[in-house]
Structure formats: structure tokens, C-alpha cells
Amino acid sequence: MFTVRKERIEFIVKGSKVIGHLFIPEDGKVKKYPAVFIDGPMTSVKEQVTGVYAKSLAELGFITLTIDHRYFGESEGTPRQYEKFPDKLLDIKNALDFLKKRPQVDERFISLVGVCLGAGYVVAAASEISGIYRLAAIAGYYRDTQEMKANNLHDFNSKVSSGKKAREQYESTGKVLYIPAASLNEEAAMQTKDTVDYYTKRAAVQNYENSFAVMSREFFTKFDVQIYAEKVTRPFLMIHSQKALSPHWADRFYNNVRTEKSRHFVESRGQTDFYDNFRIINECVQHTSKHLLPVKS
């Protein structure tokens, strides 16, 4: 077990400052470490689930980085609370460039880990970035927009349309239309009991805002994670549970991955057990660390 030093870092993406936490294992003997960028659920910030996994993996000898994406937390960018996946992918690319410049990082062994929707973001980013060592997805939210359309095309199109209208309103007036990110009592982006409990109670950190820009729906609704399964080219680990989000989507994604892959199931009561239940987190971290350890030729 390594002693870990946490460093506040920043880099610029399209003129906006991105703030992150870099977790550095301190050994005194090792000069270069494998590195991991960890991405998390929609609207989340670095002090929540990604920070937990970042610290835990750093204790096992990985340099880890987690950030507040643009529009969230301490990072700059407007409008606030804007869940726009093309911009999140660009943030990930810049985060990897940041890691490559750190003298302690072994560039040969930089991996991506995603939790919940972060799993979708990292597999999408990896399809556009060369040099990724390995991928791991923990309790991933493998959105299948084709199934969503088949189940309720009107609802799908309505959400896209409402997002477009909200964006046009913002562009013409500067006014952003918001709904809660998590709530059981009103329209919200997330409406499951365990998710609401996590964001409004257990992980209601000062840096988190329980808010979601409706204009996000123009992009977020159309984000199809399933299309990236066949684009996965790096060794892939999936960790999931039958009680996590949409296990049948996880099965579909895994079955369509054509490269080296492995899967591990854990027992959970729901999705957010993966966020702050340390029995489950420790199990996930152990399997993830083994998957990401460098295999040197």
C-alpha cells in the first residue's frame, strides 16, 4: 500500500480552466508509474465517486487523475451544469495530454476507467485516441438509443426537442432553463431512489450542484454508448451487477466487444453501492488494478 499525495491541478480547454485532483503514490524508489484517468456519472464532481476510486487506485501504485468537467464544479465554462458529451470527450483528451506531460507517468501504461455514464464517455474517447493501454468500466450506463426509440419514440424526440429549444433560448436571451439533477418530487434528470439519496444526502458535497441544464438533453439523449462496443480495441474489463443500471444493456455491450475482454459480477443493492459502499469499491478496485497493471514485454 502506497502513501498518496493529492495535488490540485489545472489545464485549459478552449479557453476554460479545468480543475482536477492528481493522486500520486509516493514510494521513493519507483520513478515512473502507470496512470489512470477516471471519469464518472453525469453531473458528478471530483469529490464524489471518481475521487474515491482515484485515491484507492493510487494506493495500489497508479497515478490517477479525476476532474471537474467544464461547466461543473470548480471548472470554468458556461452555461453551468451542461451535460454535453462532445465537450466531455474533449476534456478527456486534454486530461490524457496532461498526464503524458507529467514526469512520473509511464506513457506506455495510461488507462481509462469509467463509472456509470463515465464508462460510456471513456469508451467513446478511446475510440478516437491512440495510445490507451487498457479500459475498465464499473457499473456502466450503456445507453441504447435504438431501444429507447423503439420503446417510446415520442418521449425520446420530445426530450431532444426540449433540449434544442432550451439551447436556442440560451443563445438568444442568455437565460438557462434548469431542472434538478436528482429528485423524486419533480421533473429531474435522475429519478431513482438510490441515486437521489446519493446526490442529495450521502454525496452532497459543497462542490456539487443538484442542477441540470435542460439544453443538455439535445446531446445527452442522443448519446448512444452501444455503438462504441465494436470500436473497443484495447483490453476491456467490465464490472457490473444485476442490480446496477440496465444489466441487459451491459450484456449487449459486452457481447459486442470484439477485443480481449473479461467480466466480473458483484452483489449490490443498486447502482450507487458502487459509489460509496467500500466493500463493493474495494472489490472493484482489486479487479481493476489487476487488469490495469503493466505487462511489460
Predicted region positions:
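The serine-hydrolase catalytic nucleophile loop
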Residues: 42-55, 69, 250
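Conserved alpha/beta-hydrolase
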Residues: 56-76
